[in-house]
From Swiss-Prot:
Transmembrane segments: none annotated. Catalyzes the synthesis of the hydroxymethylpyrimidine phosphate (HMP-P) moiety of thiamine from aminoimidazole ribotide (AIR) in a radical S-adenosyl-L-methionine (SAM)-dependent reaction. It is an enzyme of class 4 (lyase). PANTHER family: PHOSPHOMETHYLPYRIMIDINE SYNTHASE, CHLOROPLASTIC, THIAMINE BIOSYNTHESIS PROTEIN THIC. Binds 1 [4Fe-4S] cluster per subunit. The cluster is coordinated with 3 cysteines and an exchangeable S-adenosyl-L-methionine. The keyword 4Fe-4S applies. This is Phosphomethylpyrimidine synthase. Its cofactor is [4Fe-4S] cluster. One of its GO terms (molecular function) is zinc ion binding. It comes from Leptospira borgpetersenii serovar Hardjo-bovis (strain L550). It comes from the Bacteria. Keywords: 4Fe-4S, Iron, Iron-sulfur, Lyase, Metal-binding, S-adenosyl-L-methionine, Thiamine biosynthesis, Zinc. The gene is thiC.
Length: 511
């Protein structure tokens, strides 16, 4: 743990057999010591005193953007600066200009602050939540624990089944990471599933209920406007967002503009009161690569840019949700247009999936797009599991989705040249070349799987120091042969001779 006088920032320390130590970003935090039997008690409220000071002072806007614009570096900002190895003033400036957000509801004191922005580490979100057809409260909290264990930076509770309020309460009291939700789901439940009966008061009541519990960011589909809906008529897959389809149905039923758009200022008031961040939803995102980058998608994106400005005028943090299903050659256009229309507000994308032909493997089809869009400047990736399009994910699906997206996020960090991103790669490569098998496992994103694959054929302890694996055996390992070659060259003075030969050739060629 790295500490200041006021708080400790969670870090995972990996101790290698050569004496080297590597410290990595750690999302599990205080939840790592929890057992399922302890979930009712929740985790420590590390922000309790910070929040109390602001309440005692009479603050009415609890958004981190509000404080950042005033030149105040909050405890949350300093916490984030430690986690990211950044200067606290740089963190404040990125939040103040809207290029990054620090989701942190004042009623989520258990939160261990993190930041989402293209100039920071690429983050990943994991979705959990029950449906009408399965999953208990305990199972959802266990999914939360499982997701952050493997590296989820935020978690969205998308529950649509029974006990939504209680499920969310358990999740929040046990979450060290920001929790996001989609309030329109519960609002629809309150009107017995009839979209036409929705209204702004039902929605605001739902919003207040969730904000009071401590939800850190809301997906609000306020950009689904009446005039954009006809653009989806000739799509291959129509409207694939649940929230988008609900609001499109309401608009057509009443032939009126989306009530979330017309009452956006009232929604802002709730966000301001609790410090909740907007995740402006892409209700018209493409659900197939054939529909990518069409009028409906980009029309909505333009409206999200307008709404971003309105939220910023009230010092409310905003990130923008994005697609979806986009072939590789169209991905960069999405990022460039989003940055232009939304003034560089953080981009938060679902993949995108780069092909539609792989049900059961969409964690792979989407991780390809995720790595690319992360490289181009996206700030947070929403994971996709192998069950995407097929069913409700279980624990193993959650793990597979998180790991696939940790790989994509790290690949993007490497491509962007994020300070320190390559250190872990170099340590693992060195351990691999030196046949330090235990260190290779420890430095892996998934040590358990790496070790189990190795031990399937070479389980003996002595094989943890062997200079080969089952792929090549003892006589054909290229790295072992390279080591022998280097040793031979060193003994025969070949390095010096090689340098002399190169110098002579350069002289002969006149270089």
């Amino acid at each position: 743990m790295e500490s200041t006088q006021e708080f400790q920032v969670p870090l995972k320390t990996i101790r290698l057999t050569d004496g080297t130590e590597y410290q990595s970003y750690h999302t599990e935090g205080s939840l790592s010591d929890k057992k399922p039997s302890d979930y009712k008690n929740g985790i420590p409220k590390i922000r309790k005193e910070w929040i109390r000071t602001r309440l005692d002072r009479g603050d009415t806007n609890h958004s981190q953007m509000y404080y950042a614009k005033k030149g105040i570096i909050t405890e949350e900002m300093r916490y984030v600066a430690l986690r990211e190895n950044m200067n606290p003033e740089f963190v404040r400036l990125e939040i103040a200009c809207g290029r990054a957000i620090l989701p942190s509801n004042r009623n989520h004191p258990e939160l261990e602050p993190m930041i989402i922005g293209r100039n920071f580490l690429v983050k990943i979100n994991a979705n959990i939540g029950n449906s009408a057809l399965g999953s208990s409260i305990e199972e959802e909290v266990e999914k939360l624990h499982w997701a952050v264990k493997w590296g989820a930076d935020t978690v969205m509770d998308l529950s649509t089944g029974k006990n939504i309020h209680e499920t969310r309460e358990w999740i929040l009291r046990n979450s060290p990471v920001p929790i996001g939700t989609v309030p329109i789901y519960q609002a629809l439940e309150k009107v017995k599933g009839k979209a036409g009966n929705l209204n702004i008061q039902v929605f605001l009541d739902t919003l207040e209920e969730r904000a009071e519990q401590g939800v850190d960011y809301f997906t609000i589909h306020a950009g689904v406007l009446l005039r954009y809906i006809p653009f989806t008529a000739n799509r291959v897959t129509g409207i694939v967002s649940r929230g988008g389809s609900i609001l499109a149905k309401w608009c057509l039923a009443h032939h009126k503009e989306n009530f979330l758009y017309t009452h956006f200022d009232e929604i802002i008031k709730v966000m301001k009161k609790y410090g909740v961040s907007f995740s402006l939803g892409d209700g018209l995102r493409p659900g197939s690569i054939a529909d990518a980058n069409d009028k409906a998608q980009f029309g909505e994106l333009e409206t999200l840019g307008e709404l971003t400005k309105r939220a910023w005028e009230e010092d409310i943090q905003v990130m923008i949700e994005g697609p979806g299903h986009v072939p590789m050659h169209l991905i960069k256009e999405n990022v460039d247009l989003q940055m232009k229309l939304c003034q560089e507000a953080p981009f938060y994308t679902l993949g995108p999936l780069v092909t539609d032909i792989a049900p059961g493997y969409d964690h792979i089809t989407s991780a390809i797009g995720a790595a690319m869009i992360g490289w181009f400047g996206m700030a947070m990736l929403c994971y996709v599991t192998p069950k995407e399009h097929l069913g409700l994910p279980d624990k193993e699906d959650v793990k597979q989705g998180v790991i696939a997206y940790k790989i994509a996020a790290h690949a993007a960090d490497l491509a962007k040249g994020h300070p320190g991103a390559i250190k872990r790669d170099n340590l693992l490569s060195k351990a691999r070349f030196e046949f330090r098998w235990e260190d290779q496992f420890a430095l892996s994103l998934d040590p358990e799987t790496a070790k189990s694959f190795h031990d399937e054929t070479l389980p003996q302890d002595r094989m943890k120091t062997a200079h080969f694996c089952s792929m090549c055996g003892p006589h054909f390992c290229s790295m072992n042969l390279t080591q022998e070659l280097r040793k031979f060259a060193q003994e025969k003075g070949m390095e010096e001779k090689s340098e002399v030969t190169i110098c002579n050739r350069k002289k002969e060629s006149g270089k």
